[in-house]
Amino acid sequence: MSGVIVVGSQWGDEGKGKIVDFFAEHADAVVRYQGGNNAGHTIWHGNTKFELSALPSGILTEGQLAVIGNGVVVNPEALLAEIAEVQSQGIAIDNLRISNRAHVIMPYHIALDKAAESSTNNRIGTTKKGIGPAYTDKISRVGIRVADLVDPDVFAKLLKEYLPFKNAQLTKLYNEEALNYDDIYETYVEYGRQLAPYVTDTSYLLGQMIANKKRVVFEGAQGIMLDVDHGTYPYVTSSNPTAGGVMNGAGVGPKQIQDVVGVIKAYTSRVGEGPFPTELHDDIADHIREVGHEYGVVTKRPRRIGWLDAVALRHAVQVSGLTKLAINSLDVLTGLKTLKIATSYTYKGEEIHHFPASDTWFEGLDVNFETLPGWDEDITGVQSFDELPANAQNYLKRISDLLSVDLLSFAVGPKPEETHLLSDVWQ
């Protein structure tokens, strides 16, 4: 086995890209297996910062493939823009591979996403990038795949078949303008021409690599608590960020996976609507938001802030089979006198240790916290676990104990050199 999954284990924005990039230095391929350009990751390449949402994190690491799997929905315009940005810094992208089975985000997906979000009072806070409508078409079997995009004749046939129905939705349901066939065809055929050199059967490619003992990292987008099945439905994404999403979204089998690394922050954050049991609305939240620069990479919206939630994290451990834990942003908590971790909930007088499926439960939910002492020492320069203040060490140990998952790494800053391993993920 030589496959490792790195998955966000909260509501996204946990710093997965940094961890993936960190492990990618010793990998032969990095694979995105779900989501689209609705979730960004910030990655440092030397002293240059990249904010990517379409390209896999591994694109910046020389020596391994960066793979967009079949479970991803691809926005060709956004992808080509990021390719141009990376190339402008002198970084080659010959290592990019795109699944011919991945679905394409079309202009009508974006238009319908914007129209639907603007027309309802029950908004779930989408990024309006067409992700949900693209996945809807995939499940409805009226989607256009990358294999279709790179074949002008097939693309023309499908666009002629699907566009009238999409235009009827836009004009009749939402009072929006219809989209022009010729404009879409000419633009997207050119996108297909530019992307064609990178398109291949990535499932076959990855199967061959793993069979030959190559090291492959699978990179989840968003987080487990945004999973369409296991997250805070309906305030979720439209795909499966859980480890199980790798099987469908990359086309590999469970026996090919060695470890599942769950990435979390030392606290909790969330963008958009939806339940958030440990959310704070005080000076502590403001402090964490400013010190941690808690604003969405894609949306730029201020993130909601809360204490660490061990109940939600145990749910993440269960549904993704986490074997290792990477804890980021420990430095953000420096200076807080006390820290809290949610260990259980109380609902209608009964203590519960599982994460509720129904969002109506959260209206009457009380959170039970465990309080730990904080630390004042500056930890940004530490080089090992033993150099951390005792209270910081105890905080990390307590998280590991509550989740029954071994600690793989901790981070005291955003840069790669500020992440410290306690063991080798590839052992």
UniProtKB/Swiss-Prot annotation:
Pfam hit, one: Adenylsucc_synt
Domain of life: Bacteria
Binding site for substrate: V297, V298, T299, K300, R301, P302, R303
Residues bound to GTP: 12-18, 40-42, 303, 329-331, 411-413
Cross-referenced InterPro entries: Adenylosuccin_syn_GTP-bd, Adenylosuccin_syn_Lys_AS, Adenylosuccinate_synth_dom1, Adenylosuccinate_synth_dom2, Adenylosuccinate_synth_dom3, Adenylosuccinate_synthetase, P-loop_NTPase
List of residues binding IMP: D13, E14, G15, K16, N38, A39, G40, H41, T127, R141, Q222, T237, R301
Localization: Cytoplasm
Catalytic activity of the protein: IMP + L-aspartate + GTP = N(6)-(1,2-dicarboxyethyl)-AMP + GDP + phosphate + 2 H(+)
Enzyme Commission designation: 6.3.4.4
Protein name per the record: Adenylosuccinate synthetase
